[in-house]
A protein has these predicted regions:
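Short, solvent-exposed beta-strand edge segments and adjacent coil->beta transition regions
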Residues: 123, 181, 227-231, 287
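N-terminal Rossmann-like NAD(P) cofactor-binding subdomain of oxidoreductases
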Residues: 1-186, 204-210, 278-282, 325
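Predominant activation on well-ordered alpha-helical scaffold segments within soluble catalytic domains
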Residues: 17, 137-144, 192-196, 244, ...
């Protein structure tokens, strides 16, 4: 597969390049960055020293590639496509939020393989899910299939600083972020609609009607670089053994999403494309914990997973990664 990358200078693009350089079926044809054209990739992504001598380019030779990854900031992908024509035979995987929500004229398939694998396999265009959205909905989807989410869901999730992107800002500065934490966008985070969209899809397919509960989501900024750890609380009288069995069955064929019987932590998933999930019951309250690496399963790892599915190769190819901590 010949690959083009647009918006090649950010954190997500750097991770994408790292994954693709080690992917046995991938060949990077071009990495576009207007601001870095002519510079070596390693001038920006210094962790790739010794792995590539590619340079950034201002060119976009779409006729020479099979698939293009959009690593733009949110809102820029749709604007780009209005000004540039990409050949119909070239597949697109967009990592921004522009096409995640279904609407008239949007042919992008929502790129969560755990529920949309068959559609992704036939898709020409895929909208890669958001990082918080991935972690939270993977924690809740089996509960939606069970039909037990009939009350508001309390969600808390903390993310690493790379989730804010490469551009420096007041809340990403080391002196502020280190030994600190804070909330942002409480009850109004942009990922909530896509979470509800997927929960509605699964709940309807299971014959449990429309999803109408509120996702009361409080996002937190953490003082670490990578990872998302989320808790989701659902009220239900269903016994824990039945819930665990349903979770294991839901993800039985998912190569990266796993229900585990012990409590989970971030170090088990950082630098991998995995999502780990654990459930506990306290009275009528079901506590679900889920965690991912925000740059991998929450971004480019899932994007490459989608690419693999789109081209009919092994879903985990190039993504058999070891956690960085142990």
């Amino acid at each position: 597969m010949k690959i083009g990358i647009l918006g090649g200078a950010g954190y997500t693009a750097g991770e994408l390049i790292r994954i693709l350089l080690n992917h046995p079926e991938a060949e990077i044809t071009f990495i576009n960055s207007e601001s870095n054209a002519g510079n070596f990739i390693t001038d920006v992504h210094e962790g790739l020293y010794g792995e590539t001598d590619l340079r950034f380019t201002s060119d976009m030779p779409f006729d020479d590639v099979d698939v293009v990854f959009f690593c733009f900031g949110h809102g820029k992908s749709e604007a780009f496509l209005k000004e540039h024509k990409i050949p119909d035979n070239v597949k697109i995987i967009d990592l921004a939020q522009d096409f995640r929500l279904k609407r008239e004229g949007n042919d992008y398939v929502y790129g969560l393989p755990e529920i949309n694998r068959a559609d992704i396999a036939k898709a020409q265009h895929v909208a890669n899910p958001g990082c918080f959205a991935t972690c939270i909905q993977l924690g809740l989807l089996p509960a939606a299939k069970l039909g037990i989410i009939d009350d508001d869901v309390s969600v808390n999730a903390i993310t690493g600083s790379t989730g804010a992107g490469q551009k420096p800002g007041a809340t990403t500065h080391f002196s502020w972020r280190n030994n600190n934490m804070s909330i942002y966008k409480p009850f109004q985070h942009q990922h909530v609609p896509e979470i509800c969209q997927s929960l509605n899809q699964v709940q309807q397919l299971a014959g449990n009607g429309d999803f109408s509960a509120s996702i009361d989501f409080i996002p937190y900024r953490g003082d670490f670089a990578r990872g998302i750890f989320a808790t989701e609380v659902v009220k239900t009288e269903l016994p824990i053994d039945d819930i665990v069995a349903a979770y294991k069955d839901f993800y039985h064929d998912a190569p990266f999403t796993h229900y585990v019987d012990k409590p989970i932590d971030l170090k088990q998933v950082v630098n991998t494309n995995k999502c780990l999930i654990h459930c506990e019951k306290y009275g009528n309250k079901l506590l679900i914990t889920s965690c991912i690496d925000n740059l991998l399963k929450g971004a480019v790892g899932q994007a490459v997973q989608n690419m693999n599915v789109m081209f009919g190769i092994e879903e985990d190819m190039g993504l058999r990664l070891k956690p960085s901590a142990f």
